């Protein structure tokens, strides 16, 4: 992705999107992102909505996933992991900006920092252009037009 392979010419960015972890409406949490090789910019399109971790991460039943509870139980011995989990559960801002060279773990949101406003605006504009070009015009996954299969 950003390794030693030759750079593809005439491409300055990688774009991505996420709409939902699962079909359950409460798991819809769309975001769009752009990466220029160093800075990773994210827009959380429904940031005002309460963010809920996907059920298969939080609930042990059905999936046998014990990592959520284990992280809570290890609060004193693994405070970094515990704080990250709590940060995830507290919701996300509309904009996030990370310096992947200096913060590959994406721990420090730099969105709005004065020294990076120009970079943030560059990425924001490029992301907006990409969304227009790909006809990605809605923020709520329920409003995305999908093909309907007609019963015969």
What are these regions (language model features)?
Residues 75-95, 100-152:
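Long, internal low-complexity/basic segments
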């Amino acid at each position: 992705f950003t390794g030693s392979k030759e750079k593809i010419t005439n491409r300055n960015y990688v774009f991505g999107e996420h709409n939902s972890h699962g079909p359950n409406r409460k798991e819809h949490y769309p975001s769009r992102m752009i990466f220029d090789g160093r800075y990773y910019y994210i827009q959380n399109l429904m940031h005002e909505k309460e963010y809920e971790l996907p059920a298969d991460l939080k609930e042990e039943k059905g999936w046998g996933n014990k990592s959520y509870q284990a992280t809570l139980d290890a609060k004193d011995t693994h405070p970094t992991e515990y704080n990250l989990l709590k940060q995830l559960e507290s919701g996300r801002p509309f904009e996030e900006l990370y310096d992947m060279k200096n913060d590959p773990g994406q721990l420090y949101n730099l969105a709005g920092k004065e020294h990076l406003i120009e970079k943030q605006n560059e990425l924001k504009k490029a992301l907006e252009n990409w969304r227009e070009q790909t006809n990605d015009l809605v923020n709520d996954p329920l409003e995305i037009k999908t093909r309907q299969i007609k019963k015969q």
